[in-house]
């Protein structure tokens, strides 16, 4: 009956609940850490890359081409590279997400900065504010909601990506899922892990949507 089936599912060691949930947590941490670190690095670099913030064309172009390079290399390729460099594990996954998202965030952030309303910045400058204060009070309030919204979207997206790159050795539940599929035997465990991944992505997608709607609402 149903109670016996549930008891077998919970108590049967073949399901490997502890290891599966640990690997799932690794995947979540990989996505979160890679996204946060990338956004923290891209934030100051975007100010240097934006033409209206840093009037140095050479520096602007160098940084923009750097962003293009980072994001043009697929995350899976970065994962393979860092798996060879650091060995299999979450560090390779975090590094792959970090490199890819630094390029993506750098491009998105710098474009957002280049499209700000200069009137607000000029208003702060007109009262004699220092250059750093002009950016702090005239620019950051305009772009911060956009930056946070974009970061939240990629955090949710990277939760899925972390599963995929895990299959090439970057750790997390993706690697465990791939190992279970290769044996061509434990299809119950495969279905179990797939359901958990879908559940986590669904939850994170809804959290991300709610937070982004609130940020957009505050901005408007």
Regions found by a protein language model. Give the residues of each.
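Transmembrane alpha-helices
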Residues: 131-165, 188-196, 200, 204, ...
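Generic hydrophobic transmembrane alpha-helix motif, especially the helices
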Residues: 64-98
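Membrane-cytosol interface at the C-terminal ends of specific transmembrane alpha-helices
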Residues: 88-139, 145-154, 209
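Periplasmic/extracellular loop-to-transmembrane helix junction in inner-membrane transport proteins
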Residues: 1-34
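Transmembrane alpha-helices and adjacent helix-loop boundaries
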Residues: 52-56, 72-78, 159
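Transmembrane-helix boundary motif in ABC transporter permease subunits
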Residues: 33-67
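Membrane-spanning helices that line or support transport/gating and their immediate boundary helices
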Residues: 43-48, 108-115, 158, 206-214
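Glycine-rich helix-loop "coupling/hinge" segments at transmembrane-helix boundaries
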Residues: 84, 159-192, 196-197, 216-220
């Amino acid at each position: 009956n149903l109670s016996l089936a549930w008891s077998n599912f919970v108590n049967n060691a073949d399901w490997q609940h502890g290891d599966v949930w640990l690997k799932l947590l690794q995947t979540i941490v990989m996505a979160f850490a890679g996204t946060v670190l990338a956004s923290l690095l891209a934030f100051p670099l975007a100010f240097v890359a934006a033409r209206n913030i840093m009037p140095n064309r050479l520096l602007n172009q160098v940084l923009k081409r750097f962003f293009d390079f980072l994001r043009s290399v697929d995350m899976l390729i970065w994962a393979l590279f860092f798996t060879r460099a650091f060995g299999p594990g979450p560090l390779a996954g975090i590094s792959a997400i970090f490199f890819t998202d630094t390029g993506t965030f750098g491009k998105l952030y710098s474009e957002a900065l280049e499209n700000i309303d200069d009137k607000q910045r000029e208003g702060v400058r007109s009262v004699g504010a220092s250059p750093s204060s002009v950016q702090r009070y005239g620019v950051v309030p305009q772009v911060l909601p956009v930056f946070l919204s974009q970061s939240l979207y990629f955090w949710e997206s990277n939760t899925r990506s972390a599963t995929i790159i895990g299959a090439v050795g970057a750790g997390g539940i993706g690697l465990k899922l791939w190992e279970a599929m290769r044996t061509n035997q434990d299809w119950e465990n495969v279905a179990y892990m797939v359901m958990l991944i879908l559940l986590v992505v669904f939850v994170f997608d809804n959290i991300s949507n709610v937070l982004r709607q609130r940020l957009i609402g505050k901005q408007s």
